[in-house]
Amino acid sequence: EDDQAFKLDIELCKKMGFNFVRKHQKLEDPRDLFWADRLGILVWDEMPSGRIFSSELIESTSKQWIELVMRDAGHPCVVGWVPFNESWGIWHVGQRPQQRAFADSIYHLTKALDPSRPVIGNDGWEYSLGDLWTLHVYYDDKKTLSEKLKDIYSNPQTSVTEAGKPRPAALPGSNPSQLPILLTECGGIGFLSPGNTIDAFAYGPIPKTEHELEIAILEVISQIERSNLLRGFVWTQLTDVQQEINGLLYFDRKPKRALEEIKKIMTRPNIEAL
């Protein structure tokens, strides 16, 4: 219960060149938002996802979401609201009108509560309503990141993910092409500490050395630079978490590469200009 842990994470983000964090699948502790306000880093608030769409999910999500927006709207660090992530809890939003109606209603509810901030209706894919078009695009052994982004922009019905069920970038009837496009999950490059044999999860091949890790990170950033479509990106992720070994830091917050080296990559001139 030490406030310094919240402060440290924000300081580490800033030392690596980041100006924004996307809080993922958690109702953030207000102490974290206090330090974000004080130290100067932008935040998106995100609602944890339900599992099975039902009347109970509609009721509980709506209630908790209203409470979250009203609780955090006074924080100047909060610059966006994310009620849904990757269609979790609304798994059939593209096929079942009831689920799409719920997702759209939460967008309108949020705008009624706080018209001053952008609302990201369904972060990652299957856009229906929202103030930004946000995409989650990871490693693909067939196409580069910039090629995939070009395909998606040309045809929003293109699936964002190659794993499991196809998930189009946008749903029929929506029109996101005039909105700012952000890559709100990318990278995801894994790296294990020497001697670690955990059953690990990461996106794409796992580098074997720190130098290979740096080259892999640089390649993703270079692809972002090559795309002229993006207005920002979110790197996956700050730290390792259990089997997820794709943090820029180990779980104990030890950097996998020197913080200043990561900052050089993340703040290249063309990235700063997004």
Give the role of each language-model region.
Residues Q25-E28, G124-W125, Y139:
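Short beta->alpha connector loops
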Residues L33-F34, E126-D131:
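Short loop/helix-cap segments at secondary-structure boundaries that form the rim of catalytic
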Residues A103-L113:
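Extended active-site neighborhood of metal-dependent phosphoesterases/phosphodiesterases
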Residues L113-V119:
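Short beta-strand/loop segments at the ligand-binding rim of alpha/beta enzyme cores
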Residues P48, E86, G124, V137-Y138, ...:
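Residues that form or immediately flank small-molecule/cofactor binding pockets and catalytic motifs
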Residues E1-I90, Q95-D104, I120, G173-S174, ...:
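Active-site-adjacent substrate/metal-binding segments within catalytic domains
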